[in-house]
């Protein structure tokens, strides 16, 4: 039985509350700023209570305000980010799942060599890989395309490693039973591995969706057309102006709208996400 210590519980709750405040306050501050005019935002001290221009700012930003600043509508920026994040998350999961499946359940020469070659890519800094990858994308004519934005980011050594470690815990008796039932590789993967892996897939999807949504450097390199910009690039372009000329009200509105999709993904998949991280039973 765990001994209840009121003082320890109080300290623990205070630390949690402090952590929540530290994380949530910048979001609240951004929301408050999104309800003010640009002049009010740059004139300190800014109020901690919402202003009178909340509906006006959001309406103007969504219906043309952002487009006048960066040359592309807010809806298009959000759509581009959604396409990129979904394609990267789904692509990474499919490729990593298939790679780990082949490495664990097939016996072929140098299979561990190929696994370690995949794993070693984790040691390479992004800056080392990004220039040759960019050259390939240019040569293939994939600048300003969704394929150029997503394909180079679909390979994932981390996800392959995590799936491999999970597959290694599959009982050998289960594999033998599938063989006795004449289950081929595809049927074994579809009927056994996929159901067992659903919580792991959900946890990885949350992580990889956020990874894809927050991409900045790669979209910055492979997009010249403003219509292919993601929401992160759009935000950066909005604050390229002089401080006094930056439409800070639109910036704050865009920032709030930019964090809503990742938050929704985390909230909607929270149960699966936590279960996928802690579940060990097969």
Swiss-Prot record:
The complex is composed of two ATP-binding proteins (UgpC), two transmembrane proteins (UgpA and UgpE) and a solute-binding protein (UgpB). Gene3D superfamilies: MetI-like. Residues 78-269 form the ABC transmembrane type-1 domain. It is a multi-pass membrane protein. Belongs to the binding-protein-dependent transport system permease family. It holds the Pfam family BPD_transp_1. GO terms for cellular component: plasma membrane. Keywords: Cell inner membrane, Cell membrane, Membrane, Transmembrane, Transmembrane helix, Transport. The chain crosses the membrane at residues 14-34, 86-106, 112-132, 146-168, 201-221, 248-268. It comes from Brucella melitensis biotype 1 (strain ATCC 23456 / CCUG 17765 / NCTC 10094 / 16M). It comes from the Bacteria. Its main location: membrane. The keyword Transport applies. Signal peptide: none annotated. It is found in: Cell inner membrane. GO terms for biological process: transmembrane transport. Part of the ABC transporter complex UgpBAEC involved in sn-glycerol-3-phosphate (G3P) import. Probably responsible for the translocation of the substrate across the membrane. This is sn-glycerol-3-phosphate transport system permease protein UgpE.
């Amino acid at each position: 039985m765990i001994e209840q210590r009121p003082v320890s519980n109080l300290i623990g709750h205070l630390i949690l509350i402090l952590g929540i405040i530290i994380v949530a306050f910048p979001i609240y501050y951004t929301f408050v700023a999104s309800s003010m005019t640009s002049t009010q935002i740059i004139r300190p001290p800014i109020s901690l209570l919402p202003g009178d221009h909340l509906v006006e700012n959001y309406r103007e930003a969504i219906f043309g305000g952002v487009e006048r600043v960066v040359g592309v509508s807010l809806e298009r920026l959000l759509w581009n980010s959604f396409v990129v994040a979904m394609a990267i998350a789904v692509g990474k999961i499919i490729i990593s799942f298939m790679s780990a499946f082949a490495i664990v359940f097939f016996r072929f020469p140098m299979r561990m060599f190929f696994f370690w070659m995949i794993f070693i890519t984790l040691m390479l800094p992004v800056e080392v890989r990004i220039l040759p990858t960019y050259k390939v994308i240019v040569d293939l004519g994939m600048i300003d395309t969704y394929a150029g934005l997503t394909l180079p980011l679909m390979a994932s050594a981390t996800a392959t490693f995590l799936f491999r470690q999970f597959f290694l815990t599959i009982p050998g008796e289960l594999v033998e039973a599938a063989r006795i039932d004449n289950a081929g590789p595809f049927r074994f993967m579809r009927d056994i591995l996929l159901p067992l892996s659903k919580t792991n897939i959900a946890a990885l999807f949350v992580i990889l969706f956020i990874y894809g949504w927050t991409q900045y450097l790669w979209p910055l390199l492979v997009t010249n057309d403003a219509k292919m910009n993601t929401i992160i690039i759009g935000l950066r372009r909005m604050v390229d102006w002089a401080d006094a000329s930056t439409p800070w009200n639109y910036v704050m509105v865009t920032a709030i709208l930019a964090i809503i999709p990742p938050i929704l993904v985390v909230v909607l998949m929270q149960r699966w996400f936590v279960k996928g991280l802690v579940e060990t039973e097969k």
